[in-house]
Structure formats: C-alpha cells, structure tokens
C-alpha cells in the first residue's frame, strides 16, 4: 500500500520513526509531520499564516519525509493534496501518550487521521500510554499492534470514512490482556491554575489537569487502564442521528 504517516509530536519524535521503519518494510511510506511539537492542536489548520514545507533526511529511514511548519491536519492535507502521492491509507502516530475518551477532541494525532477520512482516505490513529517524564520509551509493542491491526484491516475493514483509533496500554507486553473494540468514554479533569507572574499586562498562569475518576465501564478509558489494547471506530460526522427526527419535528413545524 501507499501509506502517509504523520503525527502531532513532530517529525523527529521516536514514535513516528519506529512506526515508519517497520511499515516501510512492506509498504511505500511517505512521512509528512510537523516540524515541531504540536500536541493538542485538535483539528486546527493554518489559514492566517503561510506554512513552510521542507524535505528532510531521517537517519535509518529509506522513505521520503517532509516537515511542515503547520498543524497535524495541515500535514495530512499536504500529503494528500500537495505531494500527490496517491495515498491509500493515512496512519497518524505513534503518539506519546494515549488518545482516549473525549480527549480525542483535543488530539492532533486523531485529527490528522480524521482529516484523511474527510478526503476519502481510510485512516488509523495510534497512541501509546506512557510513563510521563520518561524520554526513552520503547515503542516496539505499539508498532506490533499497529501492524497487526493494519494487516487485519486491509483485508477485512478499511473504510474511507472511518478512523480506527488504536491505543496501547502502559503495561509490559507480556501482561497485555488482548484487544477490546469499544466506545469512547468521557474524559473530565480537575484543572488547577497556577500563577506564574503578575504585572500590568495581566496575570500569567500555567495549568495542571488531574483526570477525574473513570465511571464508564466498557469504554476505551476503562479498558486501557485494565491492560487492554483498545480500538474504537471514529467518524467525522457529529450528527446525533438518534434524535435527528425528533429535533426535525420540533423545529420544522
């Protein structure tokens, strides 16, 4: 397959390099990724400023690679619309940290994959829960699961309007219990605002968020922290079809 690989952690992030090394053994890979760290960019795109696209050399990789000064969604657009590589699949990741629950709405990783489906290209988002503060993460288990899901999906289930959102738990590989296909949960946080500086220009704060207790069983949040790999099909259409007819009756009287 002709695969576009992107992320939101930046073109030199170890997760994207580990993924590209393995995927490129069996597929034609093009990397288009942000020049810098762009986590939590959500689905933003660059419309008020120009973007810089630069071909890059990444040691150990024998595939085309480009850095983009914009957002993860910009990167997907560049890969699909500007480079014209006839992409058949978009893979976004491997993200350092999980993208589960309603956190997916903030995620540049997931949004880069969703951008692919908006343009009719099947997409997979891959993220791995990590021990924060640790810089030498081993992404090999996440790579194995990504390839396993890719191999199954390309034979059984790759749909042009669906993102497969894959998350790997922070468990030793031998202790992972298997894979659960499940719904997203609801992520809420207790946010603390910490004053850093105060002057005539205003008050400068940093934030610290602590996740509230997970209440929804059978969700991606629940299963991930029980030691399961989670897989959730996502769609860019936010329409609530369950109540669409009821709302129509009320407002189209």
Swiss-Prot record:
Alphabetically ordered keywords of this record: Cytoplasm, Hydrolase, Metal-binding, Nucleotide-binding
EC number(s) on file: 3.1.3.5
SUPFAM superfamilies: SurE-like
Keyword Cytoplasm: yes
InterPro entries: SurE (IPR030048), SurE-like_Pase/nucleotidase (IPR002828), SurE-like_sf (IPR036523)
Binding site residues for a divalent metal cation: 8-9, 39, 95
Family membership noted in the UniProt record: Belongs to the SurE nucleotidase family.
Role this protein plays: Nucleotidase that shows phosphatase activity on nucleoside 5'-monophosphates.
Protein name (record): 5'-nucleotidase SurE
Organism of origin: Clostridium beijerinckii (strain ATCC 51743 / NCIMB 8052) (Clostridium acetobutylicum)
Taxonomic path: Bacteria, Bacillati, Bacillota, Clostridia, Eubacteriales
